[in-house]
C-alpha cells in the first residue's frame, strides 16, 4: 500500500457528524449501492474474540486482489476524530494489512484473507483498542493513477459519522 493513510478529506466531514450509540457484538450493517466504482461497499461486519478484532467487507461487484484498497478509520475515545487506521491493500502481488496512526507510523500488523470474489477479512490485535470504539470504512479506487484518494474515487460507510463497536 504505497498511499499514506492520511489522505482523507472525508475525515473533516466526519468530525462534525453525530456519533451513534454503542452496540452489541458481532454486528453487520449495509451501505447502499451508491457509487459507480469497482469497490462499492455493500455489507460491513465487525467481530472480536479475546485476542483479535475482525472486520469483513463485502462489495456489490466482484473485485481482483490487485484492486483491494480498504481503510477503517478508528476513533478510540469517542471524540469524533480518527485516532488510527486499519488497512487492507495489495503490494508485491499479495494482500497485506497493517494498522497505522494518522502520521503513517505502523502500530501493528494485520492479517488479510479473501472470503470470496466480493469480500475480504482484516484481523488485528485487540490490544490496540480500548473497551469500546467507533469506526468508518472507506473503499478507494484510484481511477486516475495518482495514488491519492481524490473526490469521486471512494465509497464511505457509514455515509456520515461512525459505527460503534462495544468490546
Predicted features by range, described:
Residues 99-130:
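Acidic, glycine-rich flexible loop segments
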Residues 59-61, 124-128, 139-141:
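A mature extracytoplasmic/lumenal domain signature
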Residues 76-89, 129-167:
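Acidic/polar low-complexity flexible segments
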Residues 15-22:
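C-terminal segment of classical bacterial N-terminal signal peptides
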Residues 1-8:
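Bacterial N-terminal signal peptides that target proteins for export
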Residues 9-14:
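Hydrophobic helical h-region of N-terminal Sec-dependent signal peptides
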Residues 26-93, 143-147:
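Surface-exposed, glycine/proline- and aromatic-rich loop segments on solvent-exposed faces
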Residues 24, 92-105:
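Solvent-exposed beta-strand/loop surfaces of large extracellular or lumenal domains
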Amino acid at each position: 500500500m504505497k498511499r499514506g493513510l492520511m489522505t482523507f478529506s472525508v475525515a473533516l466531514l466526519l468530525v462534525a457528524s453525530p456519533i451513534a450509540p454503542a452496540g452489541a457484538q458481532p454486528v453487520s450493517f449495509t451501505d447502499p449501492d451508491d457509487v459507480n466504482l469497482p469497490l462499492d461497499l455493500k455489507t460491513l461486519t465487525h467481530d472480536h474474540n479475546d485476542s483479535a478484532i475482525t472486520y469483513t467487507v463485502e462489495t456489490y461487484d466482484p473485485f481482483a486482489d490487485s484492486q483491494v484498497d480498504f481503510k477503517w478509520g478508528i476513533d478510540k475515545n469517542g471524540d469524533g476524530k480518527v485516532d488510527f487506521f486499519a488497512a487492507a491493500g495489495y503490494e508485491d502481488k499479495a494482500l497485506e494489512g497493517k494498522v497505522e496512526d494518522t502520521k503513517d507510523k505502523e502500530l501493528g500488523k494485520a492479517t488479510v484473507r479473501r472470503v470470496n470474489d466480493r469480500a475480504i477479512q482484516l484481523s488485528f490485535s485487540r490490544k490496540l483498542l480500548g473497551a469500546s470504539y467507533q469506526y468508518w470504512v472507506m473503499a478507494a479506487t484510484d481511477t486516475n493513477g495518482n495514488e491519492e484518494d481524490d473526490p469521486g474515487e471512494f465509497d464511505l460507510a457509514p455515509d456520515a459519522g461512525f459505527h460503534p463497536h462495544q468490546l
